[in-house]
């Protein structure tokens, strides 16, 4: 056996792969979200969400061909719940972006996974890590700037997106025994059925313009198909509490992507925030239970 094969099959690398998959998904999502903004003037929030999820579903169905795998009635119900919250999460977040700033929408939405992490915390160190992540997010995101005069409907949409995000983690964990490609393809298809009526009603035939479809396909691949597939791989092995804390890295990745791709400047406070979020994430990984197997079919997550 070659040295490369030994490294690829090492327990240490196998343990790291779910975390690498999650980080890779967050990087892909950060890049894709920046492209998605270009669709807003063309098809609006509902149309952007419909293109993103609908085209992702087509790509994932073509790649994974989920009908090849057996699907029990219980798993079908779980997939429906997973797809429902996935669709509502995407739609409500884009609806929030119509009237409130991106940073504030992200900050409000992150209350969902961080609350889930708090609920599943059992030790003092767990609560401290969640607190460190929250403090980092508060410094990184413009939570307090321009808070006066915020559109309450936009805030409500962002809060609902946060609730759906927490449920997405819970329901995704319950599908961790399934093939990752099967679960994400069926879930994304269900999400598309939820969103497409809103997108078609708001944008109409503009959704079918060749330039819009091409942009939408790029957004779908980078911001949905790839990251959600990687997240399903990660959810098979990462506990919900650890997953919720690790998601706080996403805005930090977005901020650094903006610095590299858009030449945006980060303040000293924002660099400190990124360091705090990174420390919380490292702590979450180090305190995660070892040797967790994927959940058994029908077992509660």
Specify the residue positions occupied by each region the protein language model found.
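Transmembrane alpha-helical segments that form core, pore/gating elements
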Residues: 60, 116-117, 133-135, 139, ...
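Juxtamembrane helix-loop-helix junctions in multi-pass membrane proteins
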Residues: 21-56, 167-191, 205, 209
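Hydrophobic/aromatic residues within transmembrane alpha-helices
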Residues: 39, 48, 52, 96, ...
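Specific alpha-helical transmembrane segments that line the substrate/conduction pathway
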Residues: 47-57, 86, 94-124, 161, ...
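C-terminal-most transmembrane helix of multi-pass membrane proteins
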Residues: 3-8, 13, 53, 212, ...
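Hydrophobic alpha-helical transmembrane segments of multi-pass membrane transport proteins
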Residues: 23-31, 35, 63, 80-95, ...
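Hydrophobic transmembrane alpha-helices of multi-pass small-molecule transport proteins
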Residues: 111, 125-144, 161, 257-259, ...
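Membrane-interface interhelical linkers
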Residues: 1-27, 57-81, 119-128, 146-150, ...
